[in-house]
Amino acid sequence: MLLLLAEYLQQFHKGFAVFQYLSLRGILGVLTALSLALWLGPWMIRTLQIRQIGQAVRNDGPQSHLSKSGTPTMGGALILSAIAVSTLLWADLSNRYVWVVLIVTLAFGAIGWVDDYRKVIEKNSRGLPSRWKYFWQSVFGLAAAVFLYKTAPTSVETTLILPFIKDVTIPLGVGFVVLTYFVIVGSSNAVNLTDGLDGLAIMPTVMVGGALGIFCYLSGNVKFAEYLLIPYVPGSGELIVFCGALIGAGLGFLWFNTYPAQVFMGDVGALALGAALGTIAVIVRQEIVLFIMGGIFVVETLSVVIQVASFKLTGKRVFRMAPIHHHFELKGWPEPRVIVRFWIITVILVLIGLATLKLR
């Protein structure tokens, strides 16, 4: 939006041409979203408290979590609002990738909003039935996958890239739709499962989102892409503005979500942010790198799958409780220790993911 204004004002002063630089608009995206989140955060928390929109805590979880009952939830709406406003202000709105990621993010946020709303109204932690949640996730995930497949100008945008391996790619064809569906929906649910402790999900999301922003910037520049042997995806560089907005909004939210949390993001935030990461990774052809950098999300998801499968097959549980962050809590780890150690692991995994740019 402001990019169009800057383009118009260039005829009066050439200095406005500076807004053509992606790096500047990415930074402005961070600062705008961060400012909005910090400014609106206290108001949103008060509003949630007045409306008694509080978190319902399961009785079968860690006993230390019972004190969290009633903490304002649905704070993810703050994150999404800051991301949307910042992106609309600083991104090139003629870029199709910007709209794909923004629409997918808001669509999954809407699913999470309904889920959270039902939890608040019914005063339980179950929310929207799983079958309906997965149904609507599948609808939006498949819609995004089909759109990206149908509008891909070259086969490069539907080819699987293997990190660490030079000149080896796998043409997916229609299989691209299937892979994209699983990446978007899987990432959405993985972040949601991770969002069980104060600040546990948002900081890894910010770190992975920032790293994906680097991939977007490099993939959208033909010279960088050729030098680093990564796919050149014209227009993908514009997503650095969205990634910047995600970083700013996430850090602003963390200000209120850090232990002990004043507000939880709820499914409205977790489902949306996970879907956003998955969609961006698909666009820049870095699905496997997302799997590496988001290792915490992957482990959290696998712990649930293993726990359920083990109990159904043998009647025994592998972990004291799943997702795995609760397992460590029940082993006696204080909540802040679990959170920070998971953050440290994410830093390491993100660095490994970024290393794939050169190690080929």
From Swiss-Prot:
Location within or outside the cell: Cell inner membrane
Reaction(s) this enzyme catalyzes, per UniProt: UDP-N-acetyl-alpha-D-muramoyl-L-alanyl-gamma-D-glutamyl-meso-2,6-diaminopimeloyl-D-alanyl-D-alanine + di-trans,octa-cis-undecaprenyl phosphate = di-trans,octa-cis-undecaprenyl diphospho-N-acetyl-alpha-D-muramoyl-L-alanyl-D-glutamyl-meso-2,6-diaminopimeloyl-D-alanyl-D-alanine + UMP
Pathway participation: Cell wall biogenesis; peptidoglycan biosynthesis
Record keyword Cell membrane present: yes
InterPro entries (UniProt xref): Glycosyl_transferase_4, PNAcMuramoyl-5peptid_Trfase, PNAcMuramoyl-5peptid_Trfase_CS
Keyword presence, Metal-binding: yes
Its membrane topology: Multi-pass membrane protein
Keywords: Cell cycle, Cell division, Cell inner membrane, Cell membrane, Cell shape, Cell wall biogenesis/degradation, Magnesium, Membrane, Metal-binding, Peptidoglycan synthesis, Transferase, Transmembrane, Transmembrane helix
EC number annotated for this UniProt entry: 2.7.8.13
Example GO biological process: regulation of cell shape
Stored PROSITE patterns: MRAY_1, MRAY_2
UniProt xrefs under Pfam families: Glycos_transf_4, MraY_sig1
EC category: transferase
GO CC, one annotated term: plasma membrane
Cofactor(s) for this UniProt protein: Mg(2+)
Membrane-crossing segments per the record: 25-45, 73-93, 97-117, 134-154, 168-188, 199-219, 236-256, 263-283, 288-308, 338-358
Gene Ontology terms, MF aspect: metal ion binding; phospho-N-acetylmuramoyl-pentapeptide-transferase activity; UDP-N-acetylmuramoyl-L-alanyl-D-glutamyl-meso-2,6-diaminopimelyl-D-alanyl-D-alanine:undecaprenyl-phosphate transferase activity
Cited function: Catalyzes the initial step of the lipid cycle reactions in the biosynthesis of the cell wall peptidoglycan: transfers peptidoglycan precursor phospho-MurNAc-pentapeptide from UDP-MurNAc-pentapeptide onto the lipid carrier undecaprenyl phosphate, yielding undecaprenyl-pyrophosphoryl-MurNAc-pentapeptide, known as lipid I.
Family: Belongs to the glycosyltransferase 4 family. MraY subfamily.
Protein name: Phospho-N-acetylmuramoyl-pentapeptide-transferase
Organism: Pseudomonas putida (strain ATCC 47054 / DSM 6125 / CFBP 8728 / NCIMB 11950 / KT2440)
